[in-house]
Amino acid sequence: MIRQAIARVVEGQNLKESDMIEVMNQIMGGEATPAQIGALIVALRMKGETVEEITGAARVMRDHATPVRVGRVLDIDREEINLDQETMAAVLDTCGTGGSGTKSFNISTTVAFVVAACGVKVAKHGNRSVSSMCGSADVLEALGVHLDIGVDTVERCIAEEGIGFLFAPALHGAMRYAIGPRREIGIRTIFNILGPLTNPAGADRQVLGVYREDLVATLADVLCRLGCRRGFVVHGMDGMDEVTLTAPTRIADIREGRYSLSTIAPEDYGLQRCRLEDLAGGDARHNAELVRGILAGEAGPRRDIVLLNSAFALVAAGKADSIEDGMRAAAQAIDEHAALAKLNALIRMTQP
């Protein structure tokens, strides 16, 4: 099937979701050669990936991922009750596509601790750096979080502390067949888009940052098809894959299978604009210091952008009714050192 798919995409034809599912199953099953994988993803990039193609690929990656179970089970002799199903507890992810090129610090990773401190279960999906100086896995490792842990430990972190890190290479083993072609090609492809769509914990609430404005509506449509209950897809007009403070942000607001588009500005929430340099990061050690400083209460643009993005996450998780309420809750979580406590708890629970 993959040879026929390559031929069709090269001719500018779109693949149906069912076709993409068949092709991705070949790739994930080790039945496609590196040359075929490389040809397909480059052809898709040149044509432009469609909603159906991305959705089909995401479904297969989800099916092949090692599942992380976030439900806590209560045994009351007569039966077991999944507490998360019964209470409809939200599970949130703050994973973005990366690739913005803005060299900012790890905003969404910092947000994860703030949101967890506000009572949201966070299944933070991430990886090492691909296009930036420091990915989420890099900064967490520099902070003291161990990445080489079993799924049972990740599940326990989420159950007991409300936050766990889902290290993509450990949970997407079938992706090993695409690693070589991706590395050798060296350009953004559909796989850069798929990471945030394939959380192994099945997070149904999400704030997803994207590196291109046209991906806002595309990935909002994909998330709706994949069952996202509430979420936002965001793109800063300065290039950031976050809600930004230096420019307006394009946003897709997802609610129960539908989405609406809007543009917001920092001033809408009483925040001052800043420069990209004010949000800059560095290597893993430097970014770890920045994260600790923010969670310890340091003021400035970095704190402000964390508060703003945390607010969107809290609205997505159903913990805040408005962005303003979310910002107040996030500020309280930081100022009372609850967010810092979540970081320290994750470090402690992941020690060998």
UniProtKB/Swiss-Prot annotation:
EC number: 2.4.2.18
Coiled-coil region(s): none
SUPFAM superfamilies: Nucleoside phosphorylase/phosphoribosyltransferase catalytic domain, Nucleoside phosphorylase/phosphoribosyltransferase N-terminal domain
Keywords per UniProt: Amino-acid biosynthesis, Aromatic amino acid biosynthesis, Glycosyltransferase, Magnesium, Metal-binding, Transferase, Tryptophan biosynthesis
List of residues binding 5-phospho-alpha-D-ribose 1-diphosphate: 96, 99-100, 104, 106-109, 124-132, 136
This protein's record includes keyword Metal-binding: yes
Binding sites annotated in the UniProt record for Mg(2+) 2: 241-242
Cofactor: binding details: Binds 2 magnesium ions per monomer.
Amino acids binding anthranilate 2: 182
Cellular component terms (Gene Ontology): cytosol
Sequence positions that bind Mg(2+) 1: 108, 242
Pathway of action: Amino-acid biosynthesis; L-tryptophan biosynthesis; L-tryptophan from chorismate: step 2/5
Reported function: Catalyzes the transfer of the phosphoribosyl group of 5-phosphorylribose-1-pyrophosphate (PRPP) to anthranilate to yield N-(5'-phosphoribosyl)-anthranilate (PRA).
Family the entry assigns: Belongs to the anthranilate phosphoribosyltransferase family.
Subunit structure, as described in the record: Homodimer.
Protein name (database record): Anthranilate phosphoribosyltransferase
Species name: Syntrophotalea carbinolica (strain DSM 2380 / NBRC 103641 / GraBd1)
